[in-house]
Every structure is written in structure tokens, then in C-alpha cells.
From Swiss-Prot:
GO terms for molecular function: adenylylsulfate kinase activity; ATP binding. It comes from Shewanella sp. (strain ANA-3). The lineage of its organism: Bacteria, Pseudomonadati, Pseudomonadota, Gammaproteobacteria, Alteromonadales. Its EC number is 2.7.1.25. One of its GO terms (biological process) is hydrogen sulfide biosynthetic process. The active site is at S105 (phosphoserine intermediate). This is Adenylyl-sulfate kinase.
Amino acid sequence: MSNIVWHQHSVDQAARAKLKGQNPVLLWFTGLSGAGKSTLAGALERALFEAGFHTYLLDGDNVRHGLCKDLGFSVADRDENLRRVGEVAKLMVDAGLVVLSAFISPTREERDSIRARFPEGQFIEVHVSTPLSICEQRDPKGLYVKARRGEISNFTGISSPYEAPLSAELTIDTSKGDLASQVRALIDYLTAIGVINPDKAKALA
């Protein structure tokens, strides 16, 4: 690695963000399977996109079709999965995008490691705190049933722990309220911290 030198480009993040008229950021949605991470992140992305924002949604299932298709679900492979996603998200934020990532990401150490890659204010942790009982009732992929039968090992929430964030920027329980109000809460927060400027916020009203 000693012979590898970082090449500084003439176009930087600030210039890319200025061209797009937005402040780049990573919103990291974490929570149990079935908590509503992908649904919430997808609804927020749709709202931002329709208001003219340049966005990209990284989804836990989708990256395993390509970027991480060589990985399994051992502890080491899950760590590597998130490491890769964190690096991709960093590149996308550097490109000036508003990036949304929806991953169980069960440990604080994993999430804090990804946060550490970003400048202050460019990593926003969104804890989708829907209770296990509700997630298990939803079970959209039938995974909880399989985990209870012992057909899936190391399943987060059943046979493997989930460490809830201690100080997430936002906490949303999708079993309370409707999707529109939950997206509104996210938009209001992004406006309050300056990710969304007031003029563009009007388009999201």
C-alpha cells in the first residue's frame, strides 16, 4: 500500500454539490428485518427525487445481486458487506448525491465504523425502531418463520442480537402513524439541518 497515493481531482465534492444545488449526505436506515427500512427510504427518495434532488438508494437485498453477491451471511461476510456498502456510499456522497442506505446493520461498531468515514453532519443515522413483535407479524419474506424453525442461523432479532443505536439522529417506529407522516418527519429534519434549503422544501410540502 505504500506505493499507492491518493490522486486529488480538480473537481471536488463542493463543486459537484453546487452544480446539483444540494448538500450531499448519507441517510443510514437501520433496524430489524421487516421494520420498514426499505419502504421508508424508498418513499423519502421518491419525494426528494420528484422535488429535483439527485439521489440514490442502496438496498440490503439489491447489493447482494452484484456488488456483494460473493458474500454469505457469516459474521465476517456481513461485516464485509457493510464495509463495501460504506465505501460505495462514501463515493456517492463525494459525487454530490443524497444517498439513502437501508441495511439491518445490527451492531453499533459496524455503524460507527461507517459514520467515521464521513465528515461531521454527512452521516445521518435513522433508527427504524419498529418492535420485533410487529416485524415478525409482517414477515414479508417469511424469514422469521424460517428462523423460528431453525432453518436460518444467525438471524437478527431471533438467534443473533440487534444493537439499537444509542444516539441516532432520528428514530421512527413505522407501526405508529402513516408513511406520509414518517416521510414528513424526515423532510422536516433534513430542512432543519440545512440538507434541504427552504426553497426546495416548499416543493416537498
